[in-house]
Amino acid sequence: MKIPSQPRVLNELRKLVSRNELDVRALARVINQDPGLTALLFKVVGSSAYRKHQPFATVEEILHAVGVEQTFNLVQAVALSSAGSIEKNRMAYEVFWARSHAIGQLAMLIADERIAVCNIFPDQAYLAGIFHDCGVPLLMQRFPTYCAEMKLGVHGTWIDLAEEDKKFNADHCVVGYLVARHWCLPEFICDAIRYHHAISELGVHEARSMVAIVQLAIDIHS
């Protein structure tokens, strides 16, 4: 099973951010190297969660208004959906990412409304929303019958964890956790991905609020 590699732009951004080189012009130049990521970033910050800052005309404006680390989180999220590709089950793959983006947007709005209570920021919620089921495409690639067995093309249905384990000896939550770790996501977001179907196993944990937000977003989307 091959974990998708991170785009070069993302690696360059991470190096700059980790060195605390927060020159907005330099960061914007790196992001602008990838027109696809840039377009997706503008689409995300067009959400009502960032209504206080809109409209944005440049990536520099986004970095100034939203924040460097927050923008980096958003870039990570949009990069994932364009990092891999699949030849078979193309329709199911596209439906999967449409669902993930919708849940990410809902999670972002929920976090924006509940930030004083949950202490989860919109960019973090969007990142978790996009990544929460990211193990699914890898299992689609690994197992030719995964889509059919998990009924991914059936409206209103989603993956049954017990059936997934029984038929494929796999857990998309664990696979997603490994992807998140490989992409160097914050630890509490990695844990939220791992336990987003088992919130009770987290106990008193900072990922618990994130799981609650993602699950509410899933319920609203359903």
Name the predicted role of every residue range:
Residues 152-157:
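GAF sensory/regulatory domain recognition
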Residues 146-151:
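A Zn2+-metalloprotease active-site environment signal
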Residues 1-145, 159-222:
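Conserved alpha-helical "signature site"
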